[in-house]
Amino acid sequence: MRLCILIPDDADLTRYADWREQAAQIDPLLKRRGIMPSYRPWTDDPPSDTDLVMPLMAWGYHRNTARWYAQLDHWSRLAFANPLVALRWNTDKRYLLDCAAKGVPIIPTQFHAAIAAADLDAARVAFKTETVVVKPPVSAGSDDTWLLKSPQTLPVAALGRAMLVQPMMPSILTDGELSLFYLGGTLAHAIVKRPTGGDFRVQPQFGGQSESIIPPPAAVAVAEQALAAVPGEVLYARVDLVGDGCSGFVVMELELIEPWLHLNRAADDGAAFADAIASACL
Protein backbone atom coordinates (compact mmCIF):
# COMPACT_ATOMS: atom_id res chain seq x y z
CA MET A 1 0.00 0.00 0.00
CA ARG A 2 1.31 3.41 -0.98
CA LEU A 3 0.43 6.67 0.72
CA CYS A 4 1.40 10.11 -0.57
CA ILE A 5 1.53 12.78 2.13
CA LEU A 6 1.63 16.39 0.96
CA ILE A 7 4.18 18.69 2.58
CA PRO A 8 5.19 22.37 2.25
CA ASP A 9 6.50 23.48 -1.11
CA ASP A 10 10.20 24.19 -1.54
CA ALA A 11 9.81 27.89 -0.72
CA ASP A 12 8.27 27.02 2.66
CA LEU A 13 10.46 24.11 3.77
CA THR A 14 12.50 26.33 6.08
CA ARG A 15 9.44 28.07 7.53
CA TYR A 16 7.76 24.73 8.20
CA ALA A 17 10.77 22.55 8.90
CA ASP A 18 8.90 20.76 11.69
CA TRP A 19 6.97 18.70 9.14
CA ARG A 20 9.80 16.21 9.56
CA GLU A 21 8.94 15.87 13.24
CA GLN A 22 5.43 14.67 12.48
CA ALA A 23 6.74 12.48 9.66
CA ALA A 24 9.10 10.81 12.12
CA GLN A 25 6.12 9.98 14.33
CA ILE A 26 3.93 8.48 11.64
CA ASP A 27 6.51 6.68 9.46
CA PRO A 28 7.10 3.69 11.76
CA LEU A 29 3.38 3.39 12.55
CA LEU A 30 2.54 3.12 8.87
CA LYS A 31 5.41 0.88 7.86
CA ARG A 32 4.49 -1.67 10.54
CA ARG A 33 1.18 -2.03 8.72
CA GLY A 34 2.76 -2.40 5.31
CA ILE A 35 2.05 1.17 4.22
CA MET A 36 4.87 2.91 2.39
CA PRO A 37 4.59 6.69 2.88
CA SER A 38 6.14 9.15 0.48
CA TYR A 39 6.30 12.93 0.88
CA ARG A 40 5.61 15.37 -1.92
CA PRO A 41 5.28 19.18 -2.01
CA TRP A 42 1.65 20.15 -2.44
CA THR A 43 2.59 22.31 -5.44
CA ASP A 44 4.01 19.32 -7.38
CA ASP A 45 2.36 17.26 -10.08
CA PRO A 46 0.45 14.20 -8.83
CA PRO A 47 2.35 10.91 -8.63
CA SER A 48 1.39 7.94 -10.75
CA ASP A 49 2.11 5.33 -8.08
CA THR A 50 0.02 5.98 -4.98
CA ASP A 51 -3.12 4.48 -3.50
CA LEU A 52 -4.13 7.36 -1.24
CA VAL A 53 -3.28 11.05 -0.76
CA MET A 54 -3.27 13.01 2.50
CA PRO A 55 -2.55 16.77 2.53
CA LEU A 56 -1.57 16.30 6.15
CA MET A 57 1.36 18.70 6.07
CA ALA A 58 0.49 20.93 3.11
CA TRP A 59 1.38 23.90 5.28
CA GLY A 60 1.50 27.26 3.57
CA TYR A 61 -1.32 26.60 1.10
CA HIS A 62 -3.32 29.44 2.68
CA ARG A 63 -0.92 32.02 1.26
CA ASN A 64 -1.74 30.98 -2.31
CA THR A 65 -5.37 29.95 -2.27
CA ALA A 66 -5.86 30.09 -6.03
CA ARG A 67 -2.95 27.69 -6.51
CA TRP A 68 -4.33 25.42 -3.77
CA TYR A 69 -7.74 25.12 -5.40
CA ALA A 70 -6.09 24.53 -8.78
CA GLN A 71 -3.93 21.78 -7.28
CA LEU A 72 -6.97 20.04 -5.82
CA ASP A 73 -8.42 19.98 -9.33
CA HIS A 74 -5.07 18.84 -10.75
CA TRP A 75 -4.89 15.91 -8.31
CA SER A 76 -8.58 15.02 -8.53
CA ARG A 77 -8.07 11.68 -10.29
CA LEU A 78 -6.46 10.32 -7.12
CA ALA A 79 -8.16 9.05 -3.96
CA PHE A 80 -7.89 11.39 -0.98
CA ALA A 81 -8.17 10.36 2.66
CA ASN A 82 -10.62 13.22 3.12
CA PRO A 83 -12.73 13.81 0.01
CA LEU A 84 -11.98 16.81 -2.17
CA VAL A 85 -15.42 18.28 -1.52
CA ALA A 86 -14.57 18.36 2.20
CA LEU A 87 -11.11 19.87 1.56
CA ARG A 88 -12.54 22.67 -0.58
CA TRP A 89 -15.28 23.35 1.98
CA ASN A 90 -12.80 23.41 4.85
CA THR A 91 -10.33 25.75 3.13
CA ASP A 92 -12.47 28.83 3.81
CA LYS A 93 -13.51 29.40 7.42
CA ARG A 94 -16.93 30.52 6.28
CA TYR A 95 -17.69 26.83 6.73
CA LEU A 96 -18.47 27.95 10.31
CA LEU A 97 -21.50 29.82 9.00
CA ASP A 98 -22.56 26.69 7.11
CA CYS A 99 -22.23 24.70 10.32
CA ALA A 100 -24.32 27.26 12.19
CA ALA A 101 -27.03 27.03 9.53
CA LYS A 102 -27.14 23.29 10.24
CA GLY A 103 -27.61 23.85 13.96
CA VAL A 104 -24.01 23.43 15.12
CA PRO A 105 -23.04 25.74 18.01
CA ILE A 106 -20.20 27.94 16.75
CA ILE A 107 -18.31 30.93 18.05
CA PRO A 108 -20.31 33.99 16.92
CA THR A 109 -18.88 34.91 13.52
CA GLN A 110 -19.39 37.75 11.05
CA PHE A 111 -18.03 37.78 7.50
CA HIS A 112 -17.16 41.02 5.72
CA ALA A 113 -16.18 40.86 2.04
CA ALA A 114 -14.30 44.18 2.36
CA ILE A 115 -14.06 45.12 6.01
CA ALA A 116 -14.33 48.76 7.03
CA ALA A 117 -13.64 50.54 10.31
CA ALA A 118 -17.36 50.84 11.08
CA ASP A 119 -17.73 47.07 10.86
CA LEU A 120 -15.49 46.66 13.88
CA ASP A 121 -17.64 48.97 15.99
CA ALA A 122 -20.81 47.21 14.84
CA ALA A 123 -19.34 43.82 15.72
CA ARG A 124 -18.48 44.96 19.25
CA VAL A 125 -22.07 46.07 19.70
CA ALA A 126 -23.49 42.87 18.22
CA PHE A 127 -21.23 40.63 20.30
CA LYS A 128 -21.60 42.77 23.45
CA THR A 129 -17.86 42.83 24.00
CA GLU A 130 -15.02 45.32 23.75
CA THR A 131 -12.52 42.79 22.43
CA VAL A 132 -12.78 41.05 19.08
CA VAL A 133 -10.58 38.90 16.88
CA VAL A 134 -10.19 39.72 13.19
CA LYS A 135 -8.81 37.12 10.78
CA PRO A 136 -8.92 36.21 7.07
CA PRO A 137 -11.38 33.48 6.06
CA VAL A 138 -8.47 31.51 4.63
CA SER A 139 -5.69 31.44 7.20
CA ALA A 140 -3.51 29.20 9.32
CA GLY A 141 -1.19 29.54 12.28
CA SER A 142 -2.78 32.87 13.30
CA ASP A 143 -1.32 34.60 10.22
CA ASP A 144 -2.86 38.08 9.82
CA THR A 145 -4.91 37.62 12.98
CA TRP A 146 -5.51 40.60 15.26
CA LEU A 147 -6.87 40.91 18.79
CA LEU A 148 -8.45 44.36 19.00
CA LYS A 149 -9.74 45.88 22.22
CA SER A 150 -11.80 49.07 22.15
CA PRO A 151 -10.84 51.75 21.21
CA GLN A 152 -8.30 49.99 18.94
CA THR A 153 -9.18 50.28 15.27
CA LEU A 154 -8.57 48.05 12.30
CA PRO A 155 -4.94 47.89 11.19
CA VAL A 156 -4.27 49.28 7.74
CA ALA A 157 -3.27 45.78 6.60
CA ALA A 158 -6.83 44.56 7.23
CA LEU A 159 -8.85 47.41 5.72
CA GLY A 160 -10.74 46.51 2.57
CA ARG A 161 -9.92 42.81 2.80
CA ALA A 162 -12.24 39.86 3.29
CA MET A 163 -12.28 39.22 7.04
CA LEU A 164 -14.04 37.29 9.75
CA VAL A 165 -14.82 39.02 13.05
CA GLN A 166 -15.41 37.04 16.24
CA PRO A 167 -15.62 37.91 19.92
CA MET A 168 -12.65 37.10 22.09
CA MET A 169 -13.89 34.21 24.21
CA PRO A 170 -12.75 34.72 27.83
CA SER A 171 -12.72 30.97 28.47
CA ILE A 172 -9.69 30.62 26.19
CA LEU A 173 -7.64 32.46 28.81
CA THR A 174 -9.15 30.64 31.80
CA ASP A 175 -9.90 27.12 30.56
CA GLY A 176 -8.04 26.87 27.27
CA GLU A 177 -9.13 25.50 23.91
CA LEU A 178 -10.07 21.85 23.49
CA SER A 179 -8.93 19.87 20.46
CA LEU A 180 -10.63 16.55 19.76
CA PHE A 181 -9.01 14.25 17.20
CA TYR A 182 -11.15 11.87 15.15
CA LEU A 183 -9.51 9.06 13.19
CA GLY A 184 -11.56 6.70 11.08
CA GLY A 185 -14.72 8.37 12.38
CA THR A 186 -13.92 7.64 16.03
CA LEU A 187 -12.69 9.93 18.79
CA ALA A 188 -9.06 8.90 19.25
CA HIS A 189 -7.65 11.42 21.74
CA ALA A 190 -8.03 14.98 22.97
CA ILE A 191 -5.90 17.78 24.35
CA VAL A 192 -6.40 21.17 25.94
CA LYS A 193 -4.27 24.04 24.63
CA ARG A 194 -3.62 27.10 26.76
CA PRO A 195 -2.02 30.43 25.88
CA THR A 196 0.80 31.75 28.05
CA GLY A 197 2.64 35.00 28.66
CA GLY A 198 -0.40 37.20 28.15
CA ASP A 199 -0.95 36.04 24.55
CA PHE A 200 -4.37 34.91 23.29
CA ARG A 201 -3.03 32.40 20.77
CA VAL A 202 -2.62 28.76 21.76
CA GLN A 203 -0.16 27.64 19.07
CA PRO A 204 3.28 26.46 20.27
CA GLN A 205 5.09 29.14 18.24
CA PHE A 206 3.39 31.72 20.49
CA GLY A 207 4.23 29.89 23.69
CA GLY A 208 1.01 27.89 23.93
CA GLN A 209 1.13 24.70 25.99
CA SER A 210 -0.98 21.55 25.80
CA GLU A 211 -1.83 18.45 27.78
CA SER A 212 -3.92 15.33 27.26
CA ILE A 213 -7.47 15.30 28.59
CA ILE A 214 -10.60 13.20 28.61
CA PRO A 215 -13.09 15.58 27.00
CA PRO A 216 -16.43 16.18 28.72
CA PRO A 217 -19.46 14.56 27.07
CA ALA A 218 -20.89 17.97 26.17
CA ALA A 219 -17.75 18.76 24.16
CA VAL A 220 -17.86 15.41 22.38
CA ALA A 221 -21.50 15.98 21.44
CA VAL A 222 -20.73 19.35 19.84
CA ALA A 223 -17.68 17.98 18.02
CA GLU A 224 -19.75 15.19 16.51
CA GLN A 225 -22.44 17.67 15.47
CA ALA A 226 -19.75 19.58 13.61
CA LEU A 227 -18.44 16.47 11.88
CA ALA A 228 -21.97 15.57 10.81
CA ALA A 229 -22.13 18.92 8.99
CA VAL A 230 -19.09 18.10 6.84
CA PRO A 231 -19.80 17.27 3.19
CA GLY A 232 -18.55 13.70 2.83
CA GLU A 233 -17.02 11.22 5.26
CA VAL A 234 -13.56 12.13 6.51
CA LEU A 235 -10.77 9.85 7.67
CA TYR A 236 -9.11 12.36 9.98
CA ALA A 237 -10.25 15.56 11.68
CA ARG A 238 -9.47 17.92 14.50
CA VAL A 239 -12.32 19.81 16.12
CA ASP A 240 -11.39 22.86 18.22
CA LEU A 241 -13.88 23.90 20.89
CA VAL A 242 -14.08 26.57 23.55
CA GLY A 243 -16.41 27.08 26.47
CA ASP A 244 -19.34 29.38 25.78
CA GLY A 245 -19.53 30.74 29.32
CA CYS A 246 -22.81 28.92 29.97
CA SER A 247 -21.48 25.39 30.67
CA GLY A 248 -21.58 24.53 26.98
CA PHE A 249 -19.13 24.49 24.08
CA VAL A 250 -18.90 26.11 20.67
CA VAL A 251 -16.81 25.21 17.63
CA MET A 252 -13.82 27.47 17.04
CA GLU A 253 -12.40 25.57 14.09
CA LEU A 254 -12.76 22.32 12.21
CA GLU A 255 -9.47 21.19 10.65
CA LEU A 256 -9.76 18.59 7.88
CA ILE A 257 -6.70 19.48 5.81
CA GLU A 258 -3.42 19.73 7.72
CA PRO A 259 -3.87 19.35 11.47
CA TRP A 260 -0.94 18.61 13.72
CA LEU A 261 -2.22 15.31 15.11
CA HIS A 262 -0.45 15.30 18.50
CA LEU A 263 -0.05 11.53 18.25
CA ASN A 264 2.41 11.70 21.13
CA ARG A 265 -0.60 12.60 23.30
CA ALA A 266 -2.63 9.57 22.19
CA ALA A 267 -2.95 6.74 24.71
CA ASP A 268 -2.41 4.23 21.88
CA ASP A 269 0.69 6.09 20.57
CA GLY A 270 -1.02 6.67 17.23
CA ALA A 271 -2.25 3.16 16.50
CA ALA A 272 -5.75 4.44 15.66
CA PHE A 273 -4.26 6.77 13.05
CA ALA A 274 -2.30 4.01 11.35
CA ASP A 275 -5.24 1.60 11.50
CA ALA A 276 -7.53 4.17 9.87
CA ILE A 277 -5.05 4.69 7.03
CA ALA A 278 -4.59 0.94 6.60
CA SER A 279 -8.36 0.46 6.31
CA ALA A 280 -8.63 3.25 3.74
CA CYS A 281 -5.83 1.80 1.63
CA LEU A 282 -7.46 -1.63 1.31
Q: What are the residue ranges of the model-derived segments?
A:
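Phosphate-binding site of ATP-dependent enzymes
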Residues: 141-231, 242, 250
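Residue-level preference for long, well-ordered alpha-helices that form the structural scaffold
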Residues: 15, 19-22, 64, 212-215, ...
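ATP-dependent carboxylate activation and anion-phosphoryl transfer catalytic cores
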Residues: 217-282
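Conserved N-proximal alpha/beta basic substrate-recognition cap immediately N-terminal to
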Residues: 2, 9-113
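Glycine-rich phosphate/pyrophosphate-binding beta-alpha loops
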Residues: 59, 142, 196-197, 255-265
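Anionic group-transfer/hydrolysis microenvironments
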Residues: 58, 137, 168-169, 181, ...
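Active-site nucleotide/adenylate-binding loops and adjacent lid/helix of ATP-dependent enzymes
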Residues: 1-7, 72-78, 84-175, 217-221
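Short glycine-enriched loops at secondary-structure junctions
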Residues: 59, 86-89, 193-195, 242-246
